[in-house]
Curated annotation (Swiss-Prot):
PTM info: N- and O-glycosylated.
Ranges for the Sequence repeats: 71-91, 92-112, 113-133
Organism: Mus musculus (Mouse)
Residues bearing carbohydrate: N65, N114, S319
Record's protein name: Low affinity immunoglobulin epsilon Fc receptor
Compartments in which it is found: Cell membrane; Secreted
Length: 331
Protein backbone atom coordinates (compact mmCIF):
# COMPACT_ATOMS: atom_id res chain seq x y z
CA UNK A 1 0.00 0.00 0.00
CA UNK A 2 2.75 2.47 0.86
CA UNK A 3 4.78 1.44 -2.17
CA UNK A 4 1.89 2.20 -4.51
CA UNK A 5 1.43 5.56 -2.94
CA UNK A 6 5.13 6.29 -3.32
CA UNK A 7 5.10 5.30 -6.96
CA UNK A 8 2.11 7.50 -7.71
CA UNK A 9 3.74 10.46 -5.94
CA UNK A 10 6.82 10.59 -8.27
CA UNK A 11 4.98 10.06 -11.55
CA UNK A 12 4.29 13.78 -12.35
CA UNK A 13 8.01 14.87 -12.20
CA UNK A 14 8.86 12.32 -14.91
CA UNK A 15 6.30 13.85 -17.29
CA UNK A 16 7.69 17.33 -16.73
CA UNK A 17 11.19 16.10 -17.59
CA UNK A 18 9.99 14.75 -20.93
CA UNK A 19 8.32 18.04 -21.76
CA UNK A 20 11.54 19.91 -20.99
CA UNK A 21 13.52 17.65 -23.29
CA UNK A 22 11.06 18.13 -26.11
CA UNK A 23 11.24 21.90 -25.67
CA UNK A 24 15.01 21.80 -25.83
CA UNK A 25 14.89 19.70 -28.99
CA UNK A 26 12.44 22.08 -30.62
CA UNK A 27 14.66 25.00 -29.69
CA UNK A 28 17.70 23.28 -31.23
CA UNK A 29 15.74 22.53 -34.39
CA UNK A 30 14.67 26.17 -34.60
CA UNK A 31 18.22 27.40 -34.12
CA UNK A 32 19.48 24.94 -36.73
CA UNK A 33 16.81 26.08 -39.21
CA UNK A 34 17.66 29.71 -38.54
CA UNK A 35 21.35 29.00 -39.13
CA UNK A 36 20.57 27.16 -42.37
CA UNK A 37 18.40 30.02 -43.66
CA UNK A 38 21.08 32.52 -42.66
CA UNK A 39 23.71 30.49 -44.55
CA UNK A 40 21.45 30.17 -47.59
CA UNK A 41 20.80 33.92 -47.53
CA UNK A 42 24.54 34.58 -47.33
CA UNK A 43 25.16 32.29 -50.30
CA UNK A 44 22.43 34.05 -52.30
CA UNK A 45 23.91 37.46 -51.47
CA UNK A 46 27.41 36.25 -52.49
CA UNK A 47 26.06 34.80 -55.76
CA UNK A 48 24.20 38.04 -56.48
CA UNK A 49 27.35 40.08 -55.83
CA UNK A 50 29.51 37.84 -58.09
CA UNK A 51 26.86 37.90 -60.83
CA UNK A 52 26.59 41.68 -60.71
CA UNK A 53 30.40 41.96 -60.84
CA UNK A 54 30.63 39.64 -63.87
CA UNK A 55 27.83 41.48 -65.66
CA UNK A 56 29.63 44.76 -65.11
CA UNK A 57 32.88 43.31 -66.51
CA UNK A 58 31.04 41.92 -69.51
CA UNK A 59 29.41 45.28 -70.10
CA UNK A 60 32.76 47.09 -69.97
CA UNK A 61 34.29 44.54 -72.36
CA UNK A 62 31.36 44.87 -74.75
CA UNK A 63 31.71 48.66 -74.77
CA UNK A 64 35.44 48.35 -75.59
CA UNK A 65 34.76 45.81 -78.33
CA UNK A 66 32.09 48.04 -79.89
CA UNK A 67 34.53 50.95 -79.84
CA UNK A 68 37.27 48.89 -81.55
CA UNK A 69 34.87 47.49 -84.12
CA UNK A 70 33.59 51.00 -84.90
CA UNK A 71 37.12 52.28 -85.46
CA UNK A 72 38.02 49.28 -87.63
CA UNK A 73 34.84 49.74 -89.66
CA UNK A 74 35.59 53.41 -90.25
CA UNK A 75 39.14 52.55 -91.34
CA UNK A 76 37.87 49.80 -93.65
CA UNK A 77 35.31 52.12 -95.22
CA UNK A 78 38.00 54.74 -95.81
CA UNK A 79 40.30 52.18 -97.45
CA UNK A 80 37.44 50.83 -99.53
CA UNK A 81 36.63 54.29 -100.88
CA UNK A 82 40.28 54.85 -101.82
CA UNK A 83 40.49 51.48 -103.55
CA UNK A 84 37.25 52.07 -105.42
CA UNK A 85 38.67 55.37 -106.64
CA UNK A 86 41.78 53.57 -107.92
CA UNK A 87 39.68 50.95 -109.70
CA UNK A 88 37.56 53.67 -111.35
CA UNK A 89 40.70 55.49 -112.52
CA UNK A 90 42.19 52.30 -113.94
CA UNK A 91 38.90 51.50 -115.68
CA UNK A 92 38.98 54.93 -117.29
CA UNK A 93 42.56 54.35 -118.44
CA UNK A 94 41.53 51.00 -119.87
CA UNK A 95 38.64 52.59 -121.77
CA UNK A 96 41.00 55.19 -123.22
CA UNK A 97 43.38 52.47 -124.40
CA UNK A 98 40.49 50.56 -125.95
CA UNK A 99 39.40 53.72 -127.78
CA UNK A 100 42.95 54.22 -129.08
CA UNK A 101 43.03 50.60 -130.23
CA UNK A 102 39.80 51.13 -132.19
CA UNK A 103 41.30 54.19 -133.86
CA UNK A 104 44.41 52.21 -134.82
CA UNK A 105 42.21 49.45 -136.24
CA UNK A 106 40.39 52.04 -138.34
CA UNK A 107 43.73 53.42 -139.55
CA UNK A 108 44.91 49.92 -140.42
CA UNK A 109 41.70 49.32 -142.39
CA UNK A 110 42.22 52.53 -144.36
CA UNK A 111 45.85 51.62 -145.03
CA UNK A 112 44.79 48.19 -146.27
CA UNK A 113 42.21 49.77 -148.58
CA UNK A 114 44.80 52.20 -149.90
CA UNK A 115 47.25 49.38 -150.47
CA UNK A 116 44.67 47.37 -152.41
CA UNK A 117 43.93 50.35 -154.64
CA UNK A 118 47.58 51.06 -155.27
CA UNK A 119 48.28 47.43 -156.11
CA UNK A 120 45.52 47.57 -158.72
CA UNK A 121 47.06 50.73 -160.16
CA UNK A 122 50.39 48.97 -160.31
CA UNK A 123 48.91 46.06 -162.25
CA UNK A 124 47.35 48.47 -164.76
CA UNK A 125 50.64 50.34 -165.17
CA UNK A 126 52.82 47.24 -165.79
CA UNK A 127 52.44 47.73 -169.55
CA UNK A 128 54.12 51.13 -169.38
CA UNK A 129 57.84 51.79 -169.82
CA UNK A 130 60.46 50.41 -167.45
CA UNK A 131 61.03 53.76 -165.74
CA UNK A 132 57.40 53.99 -164.72
CA UNK A 133 57.52 50.35 -163.66
CA UNK A 134 60.53 51.04 -161.45
CA UNK A 135 58.78 54.02 -159.88
CA UNK A 136 55.72 51.95 -159.23
CA UNK A 137 57.80 49.19 -157.68
CA UNK A 138 59.38 51.71 -155.33
CA UNK A 139 55.94 53.00 -154.46
CA UNK A 140 54.80 49.46 -153.73
CA UNK A 141 57.75 48.92 -151.43
CA UNK A 142 56.90 52.13 -149.61
CA UNK A 143 53.33 51.00 -149.14
CA UNK A 144 54.43 47.63 -147.80
CA UNK A 145 56.62 49.43 -145.30
CA UNK A 146 53.68 51.63 -144.32
CA UNK A 147 51.49 48.59 -143.75
CA UNK A 148 54.22 46.89 -141.75
CA UNK A 149 54.58 50.02 -139.63
CA UNK A 150 50.84 50.09 -139.03
CA UNK A 151 50.81 46.44 -138.02
CA UNK A 152 53.74 46.98 -135.67
CA UNK A 153 51.96 49.92 -134.05
CA UNK A 154 48.82 47.85 -133.72
CA UNK A 155 50.74 45.00 -132.14
CA UNK A 156 52.52 47.38 -129.77
CA UNK A 157 49.17 48.82 -128.68
CA UNK A 158 47.76 45.31 -128.26
CA UNK A 159 50.76 44.26 -126.15
CA UNK A 160 50.38 47.38 -123.99
CA UNK A 161 46.69 46.65 -123.51
CA UNK A 162 47.39 43.05 -122.49
CA UNK A 163 50.04 44.17 -120.01
CA UNK A 164 47.64 46.74 -118.55
CA UNK A 165 44.91 44.12 -118.23
CA UNK A 166 47.31 41.81 -116.41
CA UNK A 167 48.45 44.63 -114.11
CA UNK A 168 44.79 45.43 -113.35
CA UNK A 169 44.17 41.76 -112.54
CA UNK A 170 47.27 41.61 -110.30
CA UNK A 171 46.28 44.83 -108.52
CA UNK A 172 42.77 43.48 -108.01
CA UNK A 173 44.18 40.31 -106.49
CA UNK A 174 46.32 42.41 -104.12
CA UNK A 175 43.23 44.39 -103.12
CA UNK A 176 41.29 41.19 -102.42
CA UNK A 177 44.18 39.71 -100.45
CA UNK A 178 44.43 42.89 -98.37
CA UNK A 179 40.76 42.33 -97.47
CA UNK A 180 41.44 38.78 -96.37
CA UNK A 181 40.20 37.08 -99.52
CA UNK A 182 41.91 33.82 -100.46
CA UNK A 183 43.37 33.93 -103.98
CA UNK A 184 44.47 30.32 -104.35
CA UNK A 185 41.87 28.72 -106.63
CA UNK A 186 43.34 26.78 -109.55
CA UNK A 187 41.77 24.62 -112.27
CA UNK A 188 41.76 20.86 -111.87
CA UNK A 189 45.21 19.26 -112.22
CA UNK A 190 46.93 22.67 -111.71
CA UNK A 191 49.14 23.39 -108.67
CA UNK A 192 49.03 26.65 -106.70
CA UNK A 193 52.11 28.64 -105.65
CA UNK A 194 52.37 32.35 -104.75
CA UNK A 195 49.12 33.57 -106.40
CA UNK A 196 49.78 31.61 -109.61
CA UNK A 197 48.71 28.21 -110.92
CA UNK A 198 51.07 25.81 -112.69
CA UNK A 199 50.37 22.94 -115.05
CA UNK A 200 53.06 20.33 -115.70
CA UNK A 201 52.32 19.00 -119.18
CA UNK A 202 53.53 15.66 -120.46
CA UNK A 203 53.98 14.48 -124.04
CA UNK A 204 56.50 15.03 -126.82
CA UNK A 205 56.18 18.59 -128.16
CA UNK A 206 58.18 21.29 -129.91
CA UNK A 207 58.40 24.68 -128.19
CA UNK A 208 55.68 26.25 -130.36
CA UNK A 209 53.41 23.25 -129.77
CA UNK A 210 53.92 23.56 -126.02
CA UNK A 211 53.07 27.28 -126.26
CA UNK A 212 49.81 26.50 -128.08
CA UNK A 213 49.00 23.75 -125.57
CA UNK A 214 49.29 26.27 -122.74
CA UNK A 215 47.16 28.76 -124.68
CA UNK A 216 44.44 26.11 -125.12
CA UNK A 217 44.46 25.73 -121.32
CA UNK A 218 43.97 29.52 -120.90
CA UNK A 219 47.57 29.91 -119.77
CA UNK A 220 51.06 30.43 -121.21
CA UNK A 221 54.50 28.91 -120.89
CA UNK A 222 55.92 29.62 -117.45
CA UNK A 223 57.95 32.77 -116.67
CA UNK A 224 60.40 32.27 -113.79
CA UNK A 225 61.19 35.34 -111.69
CA UNK A 226 62.68 34.06 -108.41
CA UNK A 227 64.69 31.26 -106.82
CA UNK A 228 61.61 30.22 -104.83
CA UNK A 229 59.63 29.77 -108.03
CA UNK A 230 62.54 27.82 -109.55
CA UNK A 231 62.67 25.55 -106.49
CA UNK A 232 58.92 24.95 -106.68
CA UNK A 233 59.17 23.92 -110.33
CA UNK A 234 62.09 21.63 -109.58
CA UNK A 235 59.95 19.73 -107.08
CA UNK A 236 57.42 18.81 -109.77
CA UNK A 237 59.21 18.34 -113.13
CA UNK A 238 60.39 14.88 -112.04
CA UNK A 239 63.88 15.48 -113.47
CA UNK A 240 62.52 15.80 -117.02
CA UNK A 241 63.78 18.29 -119.60
CA UNK A 242 60.90 20.81 -119.94
CA UNK A 243 60.05 23.77 -122.17
CA UNK A 244 59.69 27.13 -120.40
CA UNK A 245 58.47 30.47 -121.73
CA UNK A 246 61.82 32.12 -122.54
CA UNK A 247 62.96 32.91 -126.12
CA UNK A 248 65.02 35.32 -128.25
CA UNK A 249 63.16 34.81 -131.54
CA UNK A 250 62.86 38.54 -132.27
CA UNK A 251 66.50 39.47 -131.72
CA UNK A 252 69.39 37.16 -131.02
CA UNK A 253 70.63 37.43 -127.45
CA UNK A 254 67.66 39.49 -126.20
CA UNK A 255 65.66 36.93 -124.24
CA UNK A 256 62.07 37.76 -123.28
CA UNK A 257 59.61 35.83 -121.09
CA UNK A 258 56.18 34.80 -122.33
CA UNK A 259 54.58 37.41 -120.03
CA UNK A 260 56.53 40.13 -121.91
CA UNK A 261 59.01 40.82 -119.12
CA UNK A 262 62.81 40.85 -119.58
CA UNK A 263 65.08 38.38 -117.80
CA UNK A 264 65.79 39.31 -114.19
CA UNK A 265 66.39 36.08 -112.30
CA UNK A 266 68.23 33.39 -114.30
CA UNK A 267 69.59 29.89 -113.77
CA UNK A 268 71.64 29.21 -116.91
CA UNK A 269 73.74 26.10 -117.27
CA UNK A 270 77.47 27.03 -117.34
CA UNK A 271 78.37 28.30 -120.82
CA UNK A 272 74.75 28.98 -121.75
CA UNK A 273 73.16 30.56 -123.67
CA UNK A 274 75.57 29.91 -126.52
CA UNK A 275 73.31 29.62 -129.61
CA UNK A 276 75.27 26.51 -130.47
CA UNK A 277 74.86 25.56 -134.11
CA UNK A 278 72.93 28.80 -134.70
CA UNK A 279 69.15 28.95 -134.29
CA UNK A 280 68.89 27.96 -130.61
CA UNK A 281 66.21 30.52 -129.82
CA UNK A 282 63.98 28.68 -127.30
CA UNK A 283 64.86 27.83 -123.71
CA UNK A 284 64.43 24.54 -121.90
CA UNK A 285 64.90 23.68 -118.23
CA UNK A 286 66.92 20.51 -117.81
CA UNK A 287 66.07 17.86 -115.27
CA UNK A 288 68.81 19.33 -113.08
CA UNK A 289 66.94 22.66 -113.07
CA UNK A 290 69.51 24.62 -115.10
CA UNK A 291 68.49 26.40 -118.30
CA UNK A 292 69.76 25.82 -121.82
CA UNK A 293 68.93 27.46 -125.16
CA UNK A 294 67.81 24.88 -127.71
CA UNK A 295 66.35 24.51 -131.19
CA UNK A 296 62.68 25.45 -131.08
CA UNK A 297 61.82 22.43 -133.26
CA UNK A 298 63.39 19.97 -130.85
CA UNK A 299 60.97 17.62 -129.10
CA UNK A 300 60.82 17.49 -125.30
CA UNK A 301 58.62 15.23 -123.18
CA UNK A 302 57.51 17.93 -120.71
CA UNK A 303 56.46 21.59 -120.57
CA UNK A 304 55.18 23.94 -117.85
CA UNK A 305 52.24 26.37 -118.12
CA UNK A 306 51.16 29.14 -115.75
CA UNK A 307 48.16 31.41 -115.14
CA UNK A 308 47.00 33.72 -112.35
CA UNK A 309 45.09 32.07 -109.52
CA UNK A 310 41.49 33.16 -108.99
CA UNK A 311 39.96 34.44 -105.75
CA UNK A 312 36.99 33.51 -103.60
CA UNK A 313 34.88 36.64 -104.17
CA UNK A 314 31.74 37.50 -102.22
CA UNK A 315 28.60 38.61 -104.10
CA UNK A 316 29.02 42.43 -103.60
CA UNK A 317 32.59 42.32 -104.96
CA UNK A 318 31.89 39.90 -107.80
CA UNK A 319 30.03 42.57 -109.82
CA UNK A 320 33.19 44.68 -110.16
CA UNK A 321 35.73 41.90 -110.58
CA UNK A 322 38.00 42.48 -113.62
CA UNK A 323 38.25 39.62 -116.07
CA UNK A 324 41.45 37.63 -116.33
CA UNK A 325 43.55 38.86 -119.29
CA UNK A 326 43.88 36.40 -122.14
CA UNK A 327 47.32 34.84 -122.47
CA UNK A 328 49.73 36.96 -124.46
CA UNK A 329 50.50 35.65 -127.93
CA UNK A 330 54.11 34.84 -128.60
CA UNK A 331 56.00 35.88 -131.75
Amino acid sequence: MEENEYSGYWEPPRKRCCCARRGTQLMLVGLLSTAMWAGLLALLLLWHWETEKNLKQLGDTAIQNVSHVTKDLQKFQSNQLAQKSQVVQMSQNLQELQAEQKQMKAQDSRLSQNLTGLQEDLRNAQSQNSKLSQNLNRLQDDLVNIKSLGLNEKRTASDSLEKLQEEVAKLWIEILISKGTACNICPKNWLHFQQKCYYFGKGSKQWIQARFACSDLQGRLVSIHSQKEQDFLMQHINKKDSWIGLQDLNMEGEFVWSDGSPVGYSNWNPGEPNNGGQGEDCVMMRGSGQWNDAFCRSYLDAWVCEQLATCEISAPLASVTPTRPTPKSEP
